Amino acid sequence: MIVGLGTDIAEIERVEKALARSGENFARRILTDSELEQFHASKQQGRFLAKRFAAKEAASKALGTGIAQGVTFHDFTISHDKLGKPLLTLSGQAAELASQLQIENIHLSISDERHYAMATVILERR
């Protein structure tokens, strides 16, 4: 049974401009330590960050909170399985809310084109 659905879109150029203004501080606000390692290795840091931003916003919307009520960007970690499928791991307040909602499955899709990155998150329980 679907208990949460969230979608977000991020303009890559806008994220690149924020990076140019604020540098690593902007990335640190959005990314976990493990994601920061990947960010530093990325040749397209603005695109990388826009995709993570959209995914985390989509996840927070699926939980029903947005980035508020104690839920922060650091409560969400994006990684990939061996085949490249995106995975979403929850921690902190986001994990607490997911437990209360009895979330058993999290589905994440991330896509990007020239100007935009977008993500959709579906939360399921049995």
From Swiss-Prot:
Its cofactor is Mg(2+). It holds the Pfam family ACPS. The keyword Amino-acid biosynthesis does not apply. GO terms for biological process: fatty acid biosynthetic process; lysine biosynthetic process via aminoadipic acid. Keywords: Cytoplasm, Fatty acid biosynthesis, Fatty acid metabolism, Lipid biosynthesis, Lipid metabolism, Magnesium, Metal-binding, Transferase. InterPro entries: 4-PPantetheinyl_Trfase_dom, 4-PPantetheinyl_Trfase_dom_sf, ACPS, P-Pant_transferase_sf, Ppantetheine-prot_Trfase_dom. It catalyses: apo-[ACP] + CoA = holo-[ACP] + adenosine 3',5'-bisphosphate + H(+). PANTHER family: L-AMINOADIPATE-SEMIALDEHYDE DEHYDROGENASE-PHOSPHOPANTETHEINYL TRANSFERASE, PHOSPHOPANTETHEINE TRANSFERASE. Transfers the 4'-phosphopantetheine moiety from coenzyme A to a Ser of acyl-carrier-protein. This is Holo-[acyl-carrier-protein] synthase. It comes from Vibrio cholerae serotype O1 (strain ATCC 39541 / Classical Ogawa 395 / O395).
